[in-house]
Design a protein with these regions (language model features):
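A short, Lys/Arg-rich alpha-helix, primarily the initiator
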Residues: 1-14, 52, 62
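Short alpha-helical DNA-recognition segment
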Residues: 17-34
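DNA major-groove recognition helix of helix-turn-helix/homeodomain DNA-binding modules
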Residues: 45-64
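Short amphipathic recognition helices of helix-turn-helix/homeodomain-type DNA-binding modules
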Residues: 63-73
Length: 73
């Protein structure tokens, strides 16, 4: 199963966003996105919900993202 760090990176790449652009969209710092993607910190539940809401608002279904990624391995 895809972990949160890989999910953040996958969503960001699908939307063709830089870490800085994603950070602005989520109202967090660039450093925060970088730390999430590199597994240096675990985001709070609130931050994770914000990310999932962002995905939903951008028409990315997280469960299907997980399934799609598993099929490409």
């Amino acid at each position: 199963m895809m972990g949160f760090p890989n999910m953040v990176k996958e969503v960001r790449q699908r939307l063709k966003l830089s870490q800085k652009q994603l950070a602005q969209a989520l109202s967090v710092s660039y450093t925060t996105i970088n730390r999430w993607e590199n597994s240096h910190v675990v985001p709070s539940n609130l931050a994770q919900k914000s990310f999932y809401d962002f995905c939903e608002n951008n028409f990315i279904d997280v469960p299907s993202l997980l399934t799609d990624k598993e099929h490409t391995k």
